[in-house]
Amino acid sequence: MRTAVSTIAAAAETVVPEQVCSHRGCVSRSGAACTCAAPDCAGNATRSCRTGEPIARVSGCDLRVPLVQGGFRTYANFDYAASAPALAQVTDRVNELLPYYASVHRGAGYASRISTDCYEAARVSVARAVNCAADQVVVFTRNTTDSLNLLACCVPGDTVVLDIEHHANFLPWTRRGRRVVPAAETIAETLHRIEAELCAEPAALLAITGASNVTGEVLPLAELTALAHRHGARILIDAAQLAPHRRIDLQAFAESGGTGIDYLAFSGHKLYAPFGAGVLVGRRDWLDAAPPYLAGGGAVTAVTTEQAHWAPAPQRHEAGSPNVLGAAAVAAACETLSALDEQAVVEHERHLIRRLRDGLETVAGVRQLRIFSDSADSVGIVAFTVDGFEPGRVAAYLSAEFGIGVRDGRFCAHPLLHRLGVDGAVRASVGLGTSVADVDRLLEALRRLVRDGAAWNYTYAGGQWSPLPETRPGLTEAAHGAAPCTL
């Protein structure tokens, strides 16, 4: 039986491409670079808005998706903040390792030795990419949420957080004592509030987001690091949204004779390495002093019927068979992103976001969300509402009629959405595979929605909006009976 994916792929291949390059007749995206994957071609590469040079090759840039009205269109992915497609170098690394995949550590077989070397080399690559200090270690986890829950088991005291955090950096800290500071209208006043909280009562940790997963606003990490250390606290940066867009140097803010960022957490699946691994980087002493996050093989040096002798970090918190392929993928992503021209990447994303924000300003009834009135920096994330349209209905319309993927809902940040005065929003996020043509298509689709309404009828069932009837292969009304997601 043919799967839905194979059916869609076969149908998409029957569409005559608008442009063809000289390499194997690949489809070229309108207004973007050729999507050919030939080694001597800038395949799957979006070009810099400033220089026109290829930035990076990203899987799926030539994906063609069905439209509800019939036909196919190249997918415009504005959901990078949820999960990013794989960099070509990441899939190459995984494919290279797959034939040698085996259980790591203690295996004498050739494949096991190769896998072990690759796994530990991945740890070194990640440490190098973020400029680890001598007393910091890299622990491989499942994702950012896993990393933060791990650290929450190790903190020897209270943790101070803001009320604008993703749930992953809000909920775990209740185990040892969480103190919530309400963010102010400005970043400057928010820093004053954090300092007042740390002055009033000592805390072990300040846990803060590097960039908001809802609005993309970047917090001043240098000032926050200095503030935490000034009052005897350590700092954790939730870099799930920051790491894919900016290079992070843990020692960049180190005071003379002191330390920089103490702990850093991020996910592979947002870092163009969607193979199920995450990272916690941090100072060894707390990690060594805490009980293991999970008890099991690999986390011990010796076991008797009466007691266990736990290994030091990172092995202490990596019990069980690790995700070798995921670790290798994260390392490949870190190496690839570190080798890119950071300024070119930042300028490219800023150009896209300026174009998107300026365009949204011209669409009647659109309100862009913002936390701080004085924020001057952001990554490639924009959240907005459209008067008269539920966010889920807007997202369904964009997908069904225009082949555009966005995210809608509350983005695992309920307190922040409540603070912003909305029950939900639409989030558009850009990445290395986003083109100017994608942004223009999104803006045109929103203008048509506000001006003319949707061309299709939409119904709400099973926790989501869908076109009725649903004509796209693989997406049937039967799927609407799935349990709704309330995140």
Predicted regions and their residues:
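Pyridoxal 5′-phosphate
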Residues: R2-L487
